[in-house]
Structures are given as C-alpha cells and as structure tokens.
Amino acid sequence: MALRRPMVAGNWKMNGSAQLAQELFKKFATKLQNDSAEVVLCPPSIYLESVRQLLDENKEALNGCLVRMGTQNVSQHDFGAYTGEISGQMLKDSGCRYVIIGHSERRRMYGETSDIVAEKFAAAQKHGLTPILCVGESGPAREARRTFEVIAEELDVVIEKNGTMAFDNAIIAYEPLWAVGTGKSATPEQAQEVHAFIRKRLSEVSPFIGENIRILYGGSVTPSNAADLFAQPDVDGGLIGGVSLNATEFLSLCTIAMSA
C-alpha cells in the first residue's frame, strides 16, 4: 500500500484577513510538531504576500513541518487583455505551490465548464503549480444515483485534455455539492465509497497514479467528524472551507490529520 501523506488545505474563499493569517501562524509555530501531514493555506490573492512573509518569518519555528501556500483560482491564459485574471506564472512568482481548480462555486457561479477546468489544470501544471482538482455531484444527481457517472465525466474531460500522467502531479478533492457550506457532511462511508471509485477509475489507466494520488474530502468537515472521515482508507485529508477561518479549529483538523 502506498504511503500517502495526509493534506489539510484551507480554502478561505472571499473571507479572512491579514490578522487571521497571523493568528494561524502563531498557532502553527507552537503547535505543529512534524511533517506527518501537509498543511496548505489558500487565502484570497490579496493576502498571498502576507502569507508568504509569515512563512519566511516563521521558517525556523516551522522547521520540520510542511506548511505551504496555495490559491483559489488561476487563468487558463498565460497573459493578455483579461482584466481581473491572474496567470499561473504570476501565482508561481508569488510563492504558491498549489491551486484549487474547478471548485463547485466556480463552476456554478462563474460558468466554468469542464473544458475550462481542464484548461486551467493544464495552465497550472505548465507553470509548476500542483492542481487541487475538485469533482462532485449535486443533490439531485445523488438522489438519481448518478454520483459515479457525474464524477467520471468530470475526471474524463481533464484526462482527455492532459493525459493520465498529468495526475502524477495533482491532488483530487471530492466535494459533494449538497454538503459544501451546508453544515451537512457526507458520512464516512459515503465519502469512502466515492473516493474508492475515483481511485479505481484512475487505476484503470495507471495503477501507479491510482495508488499514489491523494484524494481529499471537502464538504462541511469539522473537528467533530474529521477523525472518522480521515480514518477511511481512501480519504487522504480534507479541503476545508468555513473551519479554515477559525485558527483553533483549523489547527485541530491539522492535528487530527497528523494522527490519521
């Protein structure tokens, strides 16, 4: 069995502040003890420089720990007249290592199709960023027993454009749309079932990638349900929304992941 290091990625969405970043690093510096889990902070782009400075300032205190910086979106274009967009190279220059791709809110609110998601996946990797690719089904799709069909379609578009080996440098996040921001989480058994499907789907085209890729669960993860979720054999951590805005609770999730 592959040894996959758990990851806890905090997606602040359009929330947070420089003060929140300071609070998080104050706790990280005293409470994070080792590198058994990887912690990723994905603040709004305006705070990337603040987070990078805090990473530098706390480098000695965090020695032996894995705290990285990510972002919530990337343009599929390298440069040009795209007002408000940020390219992969710009994000790489800012110190980002990871980028969330295809979050359900981007797909739903901003019309990001699976083709656009696949292009953004490619743009991220082109500039040395690791995509955190989000996939997931809606409530009606689950009720219609179409969960696997929807997720397979979302994965296949990315595979068709980028090739299976592109997943050698990628993370997948399963985020059931009916659980995102609702306070209603998938049960550990439901999460495991879908994660196992994703892993099997990728294993069919590359056993190595299927075995080694990290698959996060995202959807109302809290300190009270994280241990059971993270204990599932195919759940490799979480993509965290609301709880990532509370320094104490987010640190609790990191600690749980370290012992998963």
From Swiss-Prot:
UniProt GO molecular function: triose-phosphate isomerase activity
Binding site for substrate: 11-13, 181, 220, 241-242
Keywords noted in UniProt: Cytoplasm, Gluconeogenesis, Glycolysis, Isomerase
Active-site residue numbers: 103 (electrophile), 175 (proton acceptor)
Biological or metabolic pathway of the protein: Carbohydrate biosynthesis; gluconeogenesis; Carbohydrate degradation; glycolysis; D-glyceraldehyde 3-phosphate from glycerone phosphate: step 1/1
Compartment(s) of residence: Cytoplasm
Chief location bin: cytoplasm
Substrates-to-products reaction catalysed: D-glyceraldehyde 3-phosphate = dihydroxyacetone phosphate
A GO CC term assigned to this protein in UniProt: cytosol
InterPro entries from the UniProt entry: Aldolase_TIM (IPR013785), TIM_sf (IPR035990), TrioseP_Isoase_bac/euk (IPR022896), Triosephosphate_isomerase (IPR000652), Triosephosphate_isomerase_AS (IPR020861)
Signal peptide limits: none
GO biological process: gluconeogenesis; glyceraldehyde-3-phosphate biosynthetic process; glycerol catabolic process; glycolytic process
NCBIfam families, sorted: tim (TIGR00419)
Full protein name: Triosephosphate isomerase
Gene behind the chain: tpiA
